[in-house]
């Protein structure tokens, strides 16, 4: 097979994918067999999380990737670059100079998949419901600037905000703002199980075994009315226990596409293969990984302990040994490719330095070695997570300042325990809800945040976050965003580690893979089609 490298044109913020590809048609067609997509995302309905696919609760990339295919939002993020554009709406925009009143007009003739008409009242119901339920996942925080939702007739929706929020159009493109049918979703109760009723480009039928979704079939919604053009009639998503099983399925032809999460070894092998029936797409991503601290926990309550960890951890070594060229060290919660990024942690701590860390602990009268347990999820972020934490353990213990053990748990157990504050130190990842610096800061630092963290900085919450949101020009918001990042680097409630790239592997007759995932890790199944094999 002759491979070629295709670089899509970079346009004002476009994160262009690089394609190591075979020849074939560039355009997919409707019809034909279902395109089968593999993922290692696990979807479980449990006592702690009974409603994994309710838009008012779901707040992880896997669940959102299902909702984005099935539940329509007023706005949508374009596949390449730029600001959100109307989707279920015909038009949207701020109607005042202060960015506090936002109005949308729904498309005429909009319907749910079952044929029920969609009105402005349904939009209001959906937003009000998410805010009323206040799910412990923290997803409702994306709508925290909404004061009231007003309707005028069947097609006009007006959002009155409690403070200026230039990022609000982005927030209306996220699943928590998705339009749901009041017939199927109670106002104050989450919808248990895996059923979804929306107006998105697909309907979804779930195959469930032992309270776990193992297979989801997405079928083209004949009532869909929006901006998306579907290149297929049906896509099947299969959940695999691990990357190895998913890779074997692709090799055997049981699946057509492999998405997150592949192992670093798989990515290296497929990228370097000179004769393969598998195509690999590499694209820049906005995913980050970090350590988070329960700042109320005795072991890390003293800021000096957290600062010492920040001073010892060697990001370059960590990335090199685990991910190689698939990731880059990160010295801020905001990725280097996002407007507003500042190398705050490098500016404060510089290169790893055990002597400096020792001095920090000594000045705070901290007895060493400090005993810590680092917790991680064994199945949510891919097979390399364990090795990553083994290296963190090795680095910290080698300093002589820490006595670190590591402990892994499945996401089903890990996430509820983290939300309850059961872990002193734990590792998490973040796929942005939208590509703006605000979404790397507010979800962790604002009130009702996604980590349920006890850390509070009043200047960040009451001054800097609101200040940054007033600026429609995000470059102008830079000073506020930089100040937030500097405070985080000093207090270390969170320690950023690295930012990663994204990869999609596919059979050679599958088209559209270069746009199957956008920069925020949104799966865009409608882009996939079938071309011609070489």
Provide a role label for each language-model segment.
Residues 30, 312-341, 384-393, 415-534:
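Detector for C-terminal structural segments
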Residues 38-97, 128, 197:
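N-terminal lobe/hinge region of extracytoplasmic solute-binding protein
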Residues 78, 173-228, 234:
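Gly/Pro-rich hinge or "lid" segments in bacterial periplasmic/extracellular proteins
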Residues 103-105, 139-184:
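Surface-exposed binding/hinge segments that line
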Residues 119-126, 156-160, 201, 232-234, ...:
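Alpha-helical secondary-structure segments
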Residues 213, 362-432:
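Ligand/substrate-recognition segments at binding pockets and active sites
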Residues 222-269:
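Ligand-site clamp/hinge motif
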Residues 329-364, 381-387:
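Structural transition elements
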